[in-house]
Amino acid sequence: MVEVYRSADAQAVERSVEAADSLPPLRLCADVEALTLGVRPPETEALRVRVDELRGRVDVARTLGLSGRIVEAHAQLSALMPEVDATDYRPLVAEAELARAGASELPEERIAALERAVWMAEVSHHDRVAAEAWVQLVEARGTGANEFVRALDAVARADAAIERIAGDPELRIRLDVA
């Protein structure tokens, strides 16, 4: 986030509070159980280095989107996806698809990215990303695509995903108002 805001334009500054609000809560840093469960690290040192590098690039692109530079964020994330997919590290694919969904202006594209993010997150036990993706899927189907029945079907899955991460109150509120 620092990298994007180092050269921020007026639009980015206006959206900086929203971008800061999108960061995971600080209390998660103290939750030892949450930090040690779930996602397995990459199997080799070389893969870990590659995943860290790509994760950094995904985070920069995601921050661009949060700062209002959606077109640039979408272009960067679309260009990154083949490299992310090539790692075959599903937690990273889930994170990248979630970021790509956030930078997608077309409802169908956003939903497709969220569905893939959910699948990759669930299969790799990346519960926080799965919960976030499920909540966004409810929002995207209910408001963006007018798929109300499918949105209602996704509510139960989103609720279960939130429970797996100890009932995150912020996600719970977003689900309740979706």
Task: Give the ranges of each region predicted by the language model.
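Tandem amphipathic alpha-helical repeat scaffolds
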Residues: 22-24, 54-68, 95-107, 132-147, ...
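Amphipathic alpha-helical segments of tetratricopeptide repeats
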Residues: 78-86, 115-123, 156-164
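N-terminal alpha-helical interaction modules that lie
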Residues: 2-71, 142, 159
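Hydrophobic or amphipathic alpha-helical targeting/insertion segments
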Residues: 3, 119, 126-139, 147-153
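Solenoid-repeat scaffolds in large eukaryotic assemblies
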Residues: 73, 80, 93, 110, ...
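Alpha-helical junction/boundary sensor with strong preference for TPR arrays
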Residues: 5-8, 12, 84, 121-124, ...
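Structural signature of alpha-solenoid helical repeat junctions
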Residues: 52, 85, 89-92, 99, ...
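Acidic, Ser/Thr-rich low-complexity linear motifs
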Residues: 7-15, 43-46, 89-92, 164-173
